[in-house]
């Protein structure tokens, strides 16, 4: 029957009690040995039910010792329940409840036959002191030396390093492989099933780096190894891996100072420097060149140097297997150093006091016990300072998880610093314990539960005590016969635990070192009903639930301790009682002191008393409510009875009730008779019943098949109905979509119709406007035609008058020519003398006479009168580009530069072309000269419009010609263009009238007009 994982972990971590080496520091003396010798070796099993631990007496001799040993090996346990058995084992170890913490150490055998050990609590302190003294004196130095090894981390580390450096390469590679594989193993504090969890794979167990961290560090160190390290550095790093293995196995890293690490690294560095060929050549060459050592002396003593130091060739690179192992070991060493330094930085500085604390003892007391509870999968509670167990429900989950992580981390850190020798000793202890455990199991009933019936036939002369049942507040036990052969009567009176019985108890009970009063011990008066080995039965009451107790059984006559048992009471089943008991703030893993035990018992008794009082009060209240309810019903019935006035009705009701009672009694009697008659069922009726039953079953099958068909039909109908409903829904949706689409199309159609109607109205409005515009244009055209007619009439009048004027001018010109011909020639060749000119004397002489004297025979009058026009619009044409209508007009003559026959002909005169075509000033311009003057040919040409052109088209042409690329109407002279031909006609008419009236007119163009201008 294998032991639980918690047992294996805890027994592996017990180094202080089973030969494990310390951390290198000398432990100081402890004031209380109970702290060191408390319950370290207890185990937490996985079985349910009570647990017990029995310390068997060791004062037997001869056959009694052999029989006792056999009985102890096959120690039976009386159990009242199959799942609440306890089993005693040699050495004080037992298998029990998972919430149980055992606490017995192996006591030494004293010469006087007493049982030595810290668990032997006696009322007589002197006897206890004597037993402890004799127990300590019984351990000789050889036994102590063979059990406990002295911790020498420096010596162990250096010895292991020297041993590793002397190993062959193949063996050394195997050692490195085994050491490297240990880094991937889960720590002993981790449960077997938790290695596959995400926490342990990716986060890493407490106290060790995670798998991802190890892989990352290995990859980084491998990159540095391949890129930056030469051959000598690789070989040096390979030996540094040996140093790490030696430090780990020898416990060199347990101390606070790094002296061991520096010494080992220095040894390896010196060896590599001495073995280096380059350094040897440099040192020898320097010594020889400096003439410190002669070559002859060097060759004479060179044989003293080991052959392996004489390198004739450079070192070769190590193999890739050894390189990978060395890289992994060094990477994990660096990670461990970094984690250790961070842990030291987070850890607060210890208090400065003169007292030196035993670090190994404190680690063994707290850390080792924590290691038994470090697996959250196997342990879900812990003990309080008074021995009570605090479950996970009584503590916050986050604090519990943090404390569990901290305990695992501390346990793994202490375990990682454990020296190699301590590990070997702990392994030896674990192996021996498992061997004893398996041997004890082989002698029992092969894993079957042991009961009191199994003790029959076993002779126990000196008695035996064992636990039979454990409750939350009571412990029941049974004992054998303690009467000796020479004394058949009780010789003493029990100090405590006495009951009202005629027979005196041979022993009394001490709980946690305190005599317990609430113990009931009874004797078996009828040995035939019980086992022949059971003489006494007892019950220890007044205990607190969820607490650990050490029950000692002491003889009344000699005050000798028979045995001691470590028992833990289970938690209370009653939720109210469990809530009434306060939870301890600090967990503890050993039994409490007598005072604390009594206080806890008193508190438990008071809690039970308060609970019973509360239940009593609750029962009283319930009874009061029930009584009040019954009283109300009684009053109701009384009122109804008193209010009943119809006696006939009451009589009929009573007769009916009597009739019902009589019928019920008759039916009951008939049923009784039928039951009596059916005592023996006939075979024919049985066969008929079988047939009817078969028929019933067939009908039932038919009914089931019909129901199944109905269900199938209903399902098919429901399916068809659902499909039809879905089709109906889809059709309805499609119809709704079509309706919506129809609505949208109708709205669009209405919008189009309204838009068309609006467009028709717009066309009608535009047509009306166009018609009105055409009417206006026709009216305007009619008015223009009327104006044209009037203008044409006026033009004809002007032409008549002009012809008359031309006739007059012709006559005047002829007269002037005749007069000039009649005058004599000048007396001098230079011309007329000053003062002799006829023009000054006769200003009324027409200019036509002067024109006859010019060599070109050009007339000044021809430059003043334009030709006649047949239309009023022909005045826009230039007189230069048109033929004269009058035969005597001088316009017919070509316009060229005249040449004089006299030497003075080239001189400028008022008759030259510059004078003839002289521009008029802007301050003296007549309407006729502005309209018909030859100085504005471009402007006149631009203003010329053909006859019969629409005025609107003329306006459009004017608008088109008003751009940048069109010719302006005012011409280059900068004159304002004439806005309308009607205005020009009017001005011409006015000018004509003024010319006819006198010589001062501005529009006639007559010589008098010219003279007027000249004046």
UniProtKB/Swiss-Prot annotation:
Keywords associated with the record: Coiled coil, Membrane, Transmembrane, Transmembrane helix, Ubl conjugation pathway
Compositionally biased region (Gly residues): 992-1004
Locations listed in the record: Membrane
Coiled-coil stretches noted in the UniProt entry, renumbered to this chain: 596-753
Primary location recorded for the protein, binned into one broad class: membrane
Topology of the protein relative to the lipid bilayer: Multi-pass membrane protein
UniProt GO cellular component terms: membrane
Basic and acidic residues bias: start-end ranges: 733-742
Transmembrane region(s): 158-178, 211-231, 254-274
Name of the protein: Ubiquitination network signaling protein acrB
Lineage start: Eukaryota, Fungi, Dikarya, Ascomycota, Pezizomycotina
Gene giving rise to this polypeptide: acrB
């Amino acid at each position: 029957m294998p032991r639980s994982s918690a047992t294996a972990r805890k027994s592996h971590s017990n180094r202080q009690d089973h030969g494990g080496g310390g951390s290198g520091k000398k432990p100081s003396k402890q004031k209380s040995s109970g702290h060191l010798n408390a319950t370290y070796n207890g185990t937490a099993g996985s079985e349910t039910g009570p647990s017990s631990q029995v310390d068997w007496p060791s004062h037997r001799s001869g056959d009694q010792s052999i029989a006792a040993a056999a009985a102890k090996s096959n120690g039976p346990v009386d159990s009242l329940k199959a799942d609440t058995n306890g089993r005693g084992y040699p050495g004080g170890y037992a298998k029990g409840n998972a919430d149980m913490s055992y606490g017995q150490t192996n006591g030494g055998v004293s010469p006087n036959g007493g049982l030595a050990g810290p668990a032997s609590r006696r009322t007589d302190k002197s006897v206890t002191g004597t037993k402890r003294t004799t127990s300590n004196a019984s351990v000789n130095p050889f036994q102590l030396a063979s059990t406990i090894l002295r911790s020498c981390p420096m010596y162990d580390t250096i010895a292991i390093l020297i041993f590793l450096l002397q190993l062959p390469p193949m063996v050394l590679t195997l050692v490195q492989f085994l050491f490297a594989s240990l880094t991937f193993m889960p720590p002993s504090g981790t449960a077997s099933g938790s290695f596959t969890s995400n926490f342990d794979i990716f986060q890493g167990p407490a106290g060790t780096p995670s798998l991802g961290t190890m892989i990352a560090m290995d990859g980084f160190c491998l990159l540095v190894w391949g890129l930056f390290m030469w051959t000598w550095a690789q070989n040096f790093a390979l030996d540094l891996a040996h140093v790490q293995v030696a430090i780990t196995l020898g416990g060199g890293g347990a101390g606070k100072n790094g002296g061991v690490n520096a010494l080992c690294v220095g040894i390896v560095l010196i060896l590599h420097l001495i073995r280096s060929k380059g350094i040897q050549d440099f040192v020898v060459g320097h010594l020889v060149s400096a003439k410190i050592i002669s070559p002859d002396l060097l060759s004479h003593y060179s044989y003293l140097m080991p052959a392996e130091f004489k390198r004739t060739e450079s070192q070769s690179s190590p193999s890739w297997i050894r390189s990978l192992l060395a890289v992994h070991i060094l990477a994990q060493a660096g990670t461990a150093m970094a984690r250790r330094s961070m842990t030291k930085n987070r850890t607060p500085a210890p208090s400065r006091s003169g007292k030196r604390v035993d670090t190994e003892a404190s680690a063994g007391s707290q850390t080792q016990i924590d290691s038994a509870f470090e697996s959250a999968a196997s342990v879900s509670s812990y003990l309080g300072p008074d021995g009570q167990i605090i479950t996970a429900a009584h503590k916050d989950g986050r604090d519990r998880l943090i404390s569990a992580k901290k305990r695992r981390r501390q346990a793994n850190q202490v375990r990682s610093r454990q020296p190699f020798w301590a590990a070997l000793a702990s392994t030896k202890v674990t192996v021996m314990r498992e061997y004893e455990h398996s041997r004890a199991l082989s002698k029992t009933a092969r894993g079957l539960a042991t009961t009191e019936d199994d003790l029959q036939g076993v002779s126990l002369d000196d008695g035996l005590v064992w636990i039979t049942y454990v409750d939350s507040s009571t412990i029941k036990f049974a004992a054998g016969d303690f009467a000796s052969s020479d004394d058949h009567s009780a010789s003493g009176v029990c100090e405590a635990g006495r009951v009202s019985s005629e027979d005196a108890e041979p022993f009394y009970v001490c709980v946690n070192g305190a005599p317990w009063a609430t113990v009931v011990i009874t004797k078996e008066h009828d040995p035939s009903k019980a086992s022949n080995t059971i003489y006494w039965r007892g019950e220890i009451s007044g205990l607190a639930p969820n607490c650990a107790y050490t029950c000692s059984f002491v003889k009344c006559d000699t005050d000798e301790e028979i045995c001691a048992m470590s028992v833990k009471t289970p938690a209370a089943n009653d939720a109210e009682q469990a809530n009434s008991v306060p939870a301890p703030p600090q967990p503890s893993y050993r039994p409490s002191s007598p005072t604390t035990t009594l206080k806890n018992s008193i508190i438990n008794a008071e809690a039970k008393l308060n609970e019973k009082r509360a239940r009593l009060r609750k029962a009283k209240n319930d009874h009061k409510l029930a009584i009040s309810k019954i009283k109300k019903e009684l009053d109701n019935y009384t009122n109804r009875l008193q209010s009943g006035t119809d006696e006939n009705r009451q009589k009929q009701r009573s007769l009916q009730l009597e009739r019902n009672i009589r019928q019920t009694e008759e039916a009951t009697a008939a049923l009784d008779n039928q039951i009596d008659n059916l005592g023996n069922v006939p075979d024919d009726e049985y066969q008929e019943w079988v047939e009817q039953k078969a028929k019933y079953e067939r009908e039932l099958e038919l009914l089931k098949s019909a129901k199944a068909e109905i269900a199938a039909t209903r399902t098919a109908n429901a399916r068809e109905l659902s499909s039809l409903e879905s089709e109906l829904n889809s059709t309805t949706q499609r119809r709704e979509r079509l309706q919506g689409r129809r609505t949208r199309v109708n709205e669009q159609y209405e919008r189009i119709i309204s838009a068309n109607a609006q467009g028709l109205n717009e066309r009608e409005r535009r047509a009306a406007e166009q018609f009105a515009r055409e009417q206006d244009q026709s009216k305007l055209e009619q008015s223009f035609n009327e104006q044209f007619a009037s203008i044409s009439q006026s033009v004809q009048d002007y032409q008549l008058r002009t012809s008359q004027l031309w006739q007059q001018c012709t006559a005047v010109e002829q007269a002037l020519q005749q007069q000039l011909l009649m005058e004599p020639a000048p007396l001098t060749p230079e011309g007329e003398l000053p003062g002799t000119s006829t023009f000054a004397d006769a200003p009324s002489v027409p200019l036509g006479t002067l024109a006859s004297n010019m060599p070109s025979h050009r007339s000044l009058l021809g430059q003043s009168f334009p030709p006649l026009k047949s239309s009023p619009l022909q005045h826009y044409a230039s007189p230069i580009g048109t033929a004269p209508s009058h035969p005597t007009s001088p316009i017919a003559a070509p316009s060229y530069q005249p040449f004089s026959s006299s030497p003075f002909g080239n001189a400028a005169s008022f008759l030259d072309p510059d004078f003839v075509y002289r521009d008029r000033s802007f301050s003296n311009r007549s309407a006729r000269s502005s309209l018909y003057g030859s100085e504005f040919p471009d402007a006149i040409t631009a203003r010329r419009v053909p006859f019969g052109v629409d005025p609107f088209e003329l306006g459009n042409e004017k608008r088109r010609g008003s751009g940048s690329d069109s010719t302006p109407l005012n011409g280059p002279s900068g004159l304002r263009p004439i806005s309308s031909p009607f205005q020009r006609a009017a001005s011409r008419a006015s000018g004509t009238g003024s010319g006819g009236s006198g010589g001062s007119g501005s529009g006639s163009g007559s010589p008098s007009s010219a003279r007027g201008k000249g004046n």
